[in-house]
């Protein structure tokens, strides 16, 4: 069938947005609502992926579990946050989706909202109790992702919710190291004004200033000095 993503028909219907047929089949056999496919995904996972809000709402009204994970550890909330499905994220949170759930990579939904630049979703997750400093298996936080990707507004959002600027990942890099390495000039400047240290060394014994390219290092040094002088 068209939109065939799964070896389970009900999952394909959820992904394709075929609400009436999905309803008909599930009302005839309730067990289909929680049937898992070859990836341990349910109809809810697939509806979240494709952004079919009405199907998600129907499944949630039936009381399907909201926190079941697929074989890569992704919950429906991970999928909806990564795909930018604002209304679905809201519905899942109302039903008690675990906001700090981690997948096989140690990532929370907030990690994906930060790297994909999903502002509204990040705010919903943080308002719902997401840990702004949650670390993945590489000890990277949402701030590392936002800084590396050049998502300035996301950096602002994370700082508003008290995210740390100086956490080091497994390579010893802070968000400022990554911003400098990726030449994210505005993000790097803003991080320095918000307390990001220019002195922390990574595993290569380099500070953010030593990682910075062009004239960025000098700009950040002057910025940090003026911040220190005003304290």
UniProtKB/Swiss-Prot annotation:
It holds the Pfam family Ank. It comes from Mus musculus. Keywords: ANK repeat, Apoptosis, Chaperone, Cytoplasm, Nucleus, Repeat. It comes from the Eukaryota. PANTHER family: CYCLIN-DEPENDENT KINASE INHIBITOR 2C-RELATED, PROTEASOME 26S SUBUNIT, NON-ATPASE 10. SUPFAM superfamilies: Ankyrin repeat. This is 26S proteasome non-ATPase regulatory subunit 10. Its main location: cytoplasm. The lineage of its organism: Eukaryota, Metazoa, Chordata, Craniata, Vertebrata. Acts as a chaperone during the assembly of the 26S proteasome, specifically of the PA700/19S regulatory complex (RC). In the initial step of the base subcomplex assembly is part of an intermediate PSMD10:PSMC4:PSMC5:PAAF1 module which probably assembles with a PSMD5:PSMC2:PSMC1:PSMD2 module. Independently of the proteasome, regulates EGF-induced AKT activation through inhibition of the RHOA/ROCK/PTEN pathway, leading to prolonged AKT activation. Plays an important role in RAS-induced tumorigenesis. The keyword Ion transport does not apply.
């Amino acid at each position: 069938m068209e939109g065939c993503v799964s070896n389970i028909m009900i999952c394909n219907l959820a992904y394709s947005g075929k609400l009436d047929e999905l309803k008909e089949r599930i009302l005839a056999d309730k067990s289909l609502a929680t049937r898992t496919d070859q990836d341990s995904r349910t109809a809810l996972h697939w509806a979240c992926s494709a952004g079919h809000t009405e199907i998600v709402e129907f499944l949630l009204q039936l009381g399907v579990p909201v926190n079941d994970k697929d074989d890569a550890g992704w919950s429906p909330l991970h999928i909806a946050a990564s795909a930018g499905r604002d209304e679905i994220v809201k519905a899942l949170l109302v039903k008690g989706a675990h906001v700090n759930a981690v997948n096989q990579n140690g990532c929370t939904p907030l990690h994906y909202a930060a790297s994909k630049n999903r502002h509204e979703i990040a705010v919903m997750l943080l308002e719902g109790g997401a840990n702004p400093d949650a670390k993945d298996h590489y000890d990277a936080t949402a701030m590392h992702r936002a800084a590396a990707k050049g998502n300035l507004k996301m950096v602002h959002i994370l700082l508003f919710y008290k995210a740390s600027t100086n956490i080091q990942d497994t390579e010893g890099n802070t968000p400022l190291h990554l911003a400098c390495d990726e030449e994210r000039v505005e993000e790097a400047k803003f991080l320095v004004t918000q307390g990001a240290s220019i002195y922390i060394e990574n595993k290569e014994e380099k500070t953010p200033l030593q990682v910075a390219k062009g004239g960025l290092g000098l700009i950040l040094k002057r910025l940090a000095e003026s911040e220190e002088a005003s304290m």
